[in-house]
Amino acid sequence: MVNYPHKVSSQKRQTSLSQPKNFANRGMSFEKMINATNDYYLSQGLAVIHKKPTPIQIVQVDYPQRSRAKIVEAYFRQASTTDYSGVYNGYYIDFEVKETKQKRAIPMKNFHPHQIQHMEQVLAQQGICFVLLHFSSQQETYLLPAFDLIRFYHQDKRQKSMPLEYIREYGYEIKAGAFPQIPYLNVIKEHLLGGKTR
């Protein structure tokens, strides 16, 4: 090998390619696990669900070189609604993803009024709306229907957090798997759709 064009030896490449990879979920962020799950659902033709981009307004860009443009100042254009949306078996799906290190509750400050309003609007149009909650310290994941989140949100605005007991009572635990990593469509089919599909 001539080591062209970057003078990187092929021996080094072989070493890095032959290193074993660890595919465990440990250390992977919850959102990355959801993205991997959505990619799996898409590849299997089960659902089309994507992360919503956050709209930003670019104010200033540095151009040290044409090929190295760098955004140096940008602002959120508007408050985002929920994290993900898409279609599953003819049903519109819209959901938010939250992760916490707390063991007994999820902070309510994580849910903003515009997100609650958006969820109410989705439910009014017969969409499937929920929140996926991940307690990283216990490695527990729950699907909480938006109806139950909204009810808790409105019942007592002074509550600073939603207790895990409430989530366990009204939500559905999702056991992590390999493919998909967070099989939330199973919960939707069995519990939110009552086993029906279109």
Curated annotation (Swiss-Prot):
Disulphide-bridged cysteine pairs: none
The keyword Methyltransferase is assigned to this record: no
Primary location class: cytoplasm
GO CC term, one of those recorded: cytoplasm
Ranges where the record places region Disordered: 1-22
Location in or out of the cell: Cytoplasm
Biased composition (Polar residues): 11-22
Keywords, sorted A to Z: Cytoplasm, DNA damage, DNA recombination, DNA repair, Endonuclease, Hydrolase, Magnesium, Metal-binding, Nuclease
Annotated transmembrane regions: none
Residues of the site described as Transition state stabilizer: 98
Cofactor(s) it depends on: Mg(2+)
Pfam families, per database record: RecU
Gene Ontology biological process terms in this record: chromosome segregation; DNA recombination; DNA repair
Free-text comment on the cofactor: Binds 1 Mg(2+) ion per subunit.
EC code: 3.1.21.10
Reaction equations catalysed: Endonucleolytic cleavage at a junction such as a reciprocal single-stranded crossover between two homologous DNA duplexes (Holliday junction)
Residue sites binding Mg(2+) per the record: 81, 83, 96, 115
Family: Belongs to the RecU family.
Protein name (record): Holliday junction resolvase RecU
Gene this chain is encoded by: recU
